[in-house]
From Swiss-Prot:
Keywords: Chaperone, Mitochondrion, Transit peptide. It comes from Danio rerio (Zebrafish). This is Succinate dehydrogenase assembly factor 3, mitochondrial. Plays an essential role in the assembly of succinate dehydrogenase (SDH), an enzyme complex (also referred to as respiratory complex II) that is a component of both the tricarboxylic acid (TCA) cycle and the mitochondrial electron transport chain, and which couples the oxidation of succinate to fumarate with the reduction of ubiquinone (coenzyme Q) to ubiquinol. Promotes maturation of the iron-sulfur protein subunit sdhb of the SDH catalytic dimer, protecting it from the deleterious effects of oxidants. May act together with SDHAF1. InterPro entries: SDHAF3/Sdh7.
């Protein structure tokens, strides 16, 4: 599935996700950006079927995040994330469950490991 149209669609989706991450709190943005980069890199050599599923799921993520960003801009209230249904979790591989668990732990830490500040913010 390495045709030019597919490659263009992957790049466009990747860039849109990174743009949406700019609206996340800085520590979650750093975590999300790194995860997206790793996942897209990891799936460069996937089969056609895996690539199709990968694109559908990341498109769903982009759509959900875009909706949440637009709602947050209107309400000035930052609420990001979504619950996964049991049905979706049943389709995950063990490695994916482990990754999801690690992401959940990292993103819900009260004192997150990232000590990142917005540009122009004094230390």
């Amino acid at each position: 599935m390495a045709n030019p149209a597919h490659i263009s669609a992957v790049r466009t989706l990747y860039k849109k996700i990174l743009v949406l991450h700019r609206f996340l709190p800085i520590d979650l943005r750093a975590l999300g950006d790194q995860y997206v980069k790793d996942e897209f890199r990891r799936h460069k050599t996937s089969s056609d079927e895996e690539a199709k599923h990968f694109m559908v799921e990341w498109q769903n993520y982009k759509d959900t995040l875009q909706t949440q960003v637009l709602e947050a801009m209107g309400n000035k209230k930052l609420v990001f994330g979504a619950d996964l249904s049991e049905d979706k979790l049943k389709h995950f591989q063990d490695e994916q469950i482990g990754q999801l668990y690690e992401l959940m732990l990292e993103s819900t830490k009260p004192n997150r490991q990232f000590d990142i500040q917005e540009e122009g913010t004094p230390k």
